C-alpha cells in the first residue's frame, strides 16, 4: 500500500517500524467508502458504536466494539497490538469531519496510541491506549493498565488548556476477538 501511494511513511519509529499516514483527502475518502462504509457501517454495529462513544456511553461503545470484532475480523488476523491499533485508527478516521484524529503522538512522558481532538472545543476529547492480553482473564487488568498509563504519562496534558472541558481517558485491551474497555473522565 505504501508503494502504490495509498499510505505514506510519516516517520521511522524503530528498526523496521514506521508510522504511516493516509496521504490525502482523496485516499481518506476512498478508505472511508471502500472499507468503513462497506465492511463496518453495513454491519449495523459501527454507527451505533461511534454514536455511543461521542455521547459518552462507553459501556455501549464497548459492547458495539466487541460486536465489530466478532462479526468483521478473523482470529488469524488479530496478532499483536499494531493490528488492533491500525483497525481502531481506521475506524476513528470516520470522525475526521468533527475531530482531528491523531496516532502515536508524543506527550509529556511517552506516546499515546490514538487521540480525538475536537474541532469544536465544546465537544469532548478522547485519549486511547491499547494493550494486548495473553489471556481472556487478563483483559480487565490490561485495560486498567492502559488507563493508568494515560494518567501516569500525562497523555491528556494540554487539552484542558486548549479549552476542552471534558476528556475521556480510555484504556482498551484485546485478546483475539475479545475486548475490554476501562475509562474515566478528566
Spans of model-derived segments:
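Domain-level recognition of nuclease-like catalytic cores that cleave nucleotide substrates
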Residues: 158, 162-186
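Extended alpha-helical interface modules used as scaffolds for assembling large macromolecular complexes
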Residues: 2-154, 179-186
